[in-house]
A protein has these predicted regions:
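A ligand-binding cleft/hinge motif common to bilobed small-molecule-binding domains
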Residues: 81-89, 201-221
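Short helix-initiation/N-cap motifs at beta->coil->alpha
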Residues: 3-5, 56-65, 182-191
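A short, structured surface patch at a secondary-structure boundary
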Residues: 16-70, 74-80, 178
């Protein structure tokens, strides 16, 4: 049963798999069924082994005709995918999975592992992720624990809230979040909200860092004044914002930046 409540029954293990979300592509690969992938979304880029696979659009513009030609046994997609109703009407199986929290990631690993015939692999991967996150938490310098973080999604105005998988990782690392839980996992924020919240640390993608620091009024933010900003290279940022089997790697990236900030003099 997927996260829309749809029950899926298969007479045989799916041999031809399409994934329409990078985290689901990565999940299938880590669970050991990468060779069964026959197509992926346009944003999937890890691991490098998938580079030659057909690209089939995204959640909102999946290339239905190309998908039909591939004759997949199952399509793995997000619950928010709006372009796959036609594919389902043609009799294809679409398994829709939610990925906003750590619990979602764990459930997705289990569901996909069961679907693809490797039921024990899902929990094994999750246990490895837990170990990696704990190891990252142990690396966070004590003086930074409890500091309040603003994690920006893309170039804004969305943020990773306390209830998102990113926010949950930050909590595991001992950090606080300027976004209150009642705003949801990935709320749209007014820039003035961030100014008023006065985060101690800002995290986001490196290519947006200069524009972020130059926003009106943001010079009053403690994180900007002290240049306490984690700007991640695009490849690392993609790891951070994908709710899948690289959560442990993401935690290590966050911890690494916090370690660097701890040894750099505040400005």
């Amino acid at each position: 049963r997927d996260d829309r409540g749809t029950e899926h029954r298969f007479d045989a293990l799916p041999q031809r798999i399409v994934t329409l979300l990078p985290s689901l592509t990565e999940t299938a690969w880590v669970l050991g069924v990468g060779p069964r992938l026959v197509g992926v979304d346009r944003f999937s880029n890890w691991p490098a082994d998938i580079a030659a696979l057909p690209r089939l659009g995204g959640l909102d513009d999946a290339q239905i005709e190309a998908l039909v030609r591939l004759k997949p046994d199952v399509v793995l997609a997000s619950t928010s995918a709006r372009s796959l109703d036609k594919l389902e009407s043609l009799g294809f199986r679409v398994m829709r999975l939610k990925s906003e929290t750590h619990a979602d990631v764990r459930r997705t690993l289990g569901l996909v592992a069961q679907l693809l015939g490797t039921p024990e692999a899902g929990e094994r991967v999750w246990v490895q992720l837990e170990v990696q996150i704990a190891a990252a938490a142990a690396r966070v310098p004590a003086p930074l624990k409890g500091q309040r973080v603003y994690f920006e999604i893309g170039g804004g105005p969305y943020a990773a809230g306390t209830r998102s998988f990113i926010g949950e990782t930050l909590v595991r690392l001992g950090m606080a979040n300027i976004v209150p839980p009642d705003l949801g996992p990935f709320p749209k924020l007014n820039p003035e909200f961030v100014v008023r919240a006065r985060p101690d640390l800002i995290m986001g993608v490196q290519r947006e860092q200069a524009a972020l620091l130059a926003r009106p009024g943001w010079q009053a933010i403690p994180a900007v004044q002290g240049q306490r900003v984690c700007g991640f290279a695009s490849a690392d940022y993609e790891t951070l914002i994908r709710p899948g089997p690289r959560l442990g790697e993401a935690a290590a990236l966050l911890a690494g930046c916090l370690q660097r900030l701890a040894v750099e003099p505040a400005r």
